[in-house]
């Protein structure tokens, strides 16, 4: 079954101040042009090259020997792997025995240089049965170079050959990591040159860890393929990605500068984190394609249902009406728990109901309350968390991001706003060729 998108609560008369047919007509031609551009100049991420799967599967006989895979990556290299792991494996996967995992690997993702995070992962692994997947497209990402150095040092301290416990995923031609592969003989996978990190989850960047923990990567690609095909339809009513872009573009022009994605499943929360990077880094731009200052973008916010009904929904219902809210809903959970009869009349309404019934009722109630308060919202329904459905989700939102970039007349595939911070970091850490002097603040406000 495909994902189902319900955009009804974004439109008049379902909410006051919602989108109208006239609003849609005003940008329909531009959206159609965005779709045609996507078809005629299909981005590499949407081509789903078969070699991506084949290159990963060529390592399967080697990978199956490891009890644990530790991904060392940040940004898209980390978030894509986390999204796959949490959405398509049980939440307690890494606590299961190898037998309970049917021989597949545990997967940990170190996506930060927080020493507590790195230590907590190292404390839980046996280097002798661990593979470190070092991922950096540039081959020089400071955070990944640091964690690579630590992991290599540990392997060498155990008397292990790093080449037998490390897999490097990087650019096919350039960068420090590719140089390492050529000089020292590490096994490697390629990050496609035309695919940016935040669009790379369906490439070897994400596929390796997915295969290692038993996720059907062919089914993942099949879902994405079908979604990309629908994303090439010019009829907006048959194209979920185009409708996502159209509605969010119109609402951005109406002052809705925040995009909330609220997942009603703990397993989907890293899908939301993945979306946050995709939407923020792709669309938050100072300049348009003409070089004019526009300072555009829509701030993505993460929420978890029902948890955040008790922290954020008050604001969403009665605070500034500056948000478009997307619900992620799962109809069928992998496991169920029935609430028992307690004998108390006050709790009888819960007796013999499934926990999932309560969770889905809370999603419906939250959605309806927002509609009553004229807060625009939409829903994406998964019949279950399967590789096919998750592949669709990735593809639809990647296509929607490309369409949104076209509508905003910006480049959704670069990220110039992150470069200065990187350069300053390199300078502070003493990297050759980088200098930066932090200026003394003329006014200081410091409280201890």
UniProtKB/Swiss-Prot annotation:
Belongs to the GPI family. Its main location: cytoplasm. Optimal activity is achieved when His-310 and Lys-422 are both present to open the sugar ring, and Glu-281 catalyzes the isomerization step. Activity is decreased in the presence of the PGI inhibitor 6-phosphogluconate. It catalyses: alpha-D-glucose 6-phosphate = beta-D-fructose 6-phosphate. The gene is pgi. It is an enzyme of class 5 (isomerase). The keyword Isomerase applies. Catalyzes the reversible isomerization of glucose-6-phosphate to fructose-6-phosphate. Does not have phosphomannose isomerase (PMI) activity. Isomerization proceeds through a cis-enediol-based mechanism. It is found in: Cytoplasm. It holds the Pfam family PGI. One of its GO terms (cellular component) is cytosol. InterPro entries: G6P_Isomerase, Phosphoglucose_isomerase_CS, SIS_dom_sf, SIS_PGI_1, SIS_PGI_2. Its EC number is 5.3.1.9. Homodimer. The keyword Isomerase applies. The active site is at residues 281, 310, 422. This is Glucose-6-phosphate isomerase. Pathway: Carbohydrate biosynthesis; gluconeogenesis; Carbohydrate degradation; glycolysis; D-glyceraldehyde 3-phosphate and glycerone phosphate from D-glucose: step 2/4. The lineage of its organism: Bacteria, Thermotogati, Thermotogota, Thermotogae, Thermotogales. One of its GO terms (molecular function) is glucose-6-phosphate isomerase activity. Changing residue 281 to A/S: Loss of activity. Keywords: Cytoplasm, Gluconeogenesis, Glycolysis, Isomerase. HAMAP family: G6P_isomerase. GO terms for biological process: gluconeogenesis; glucose 6-phosphate metabolic process; glycolytic process.
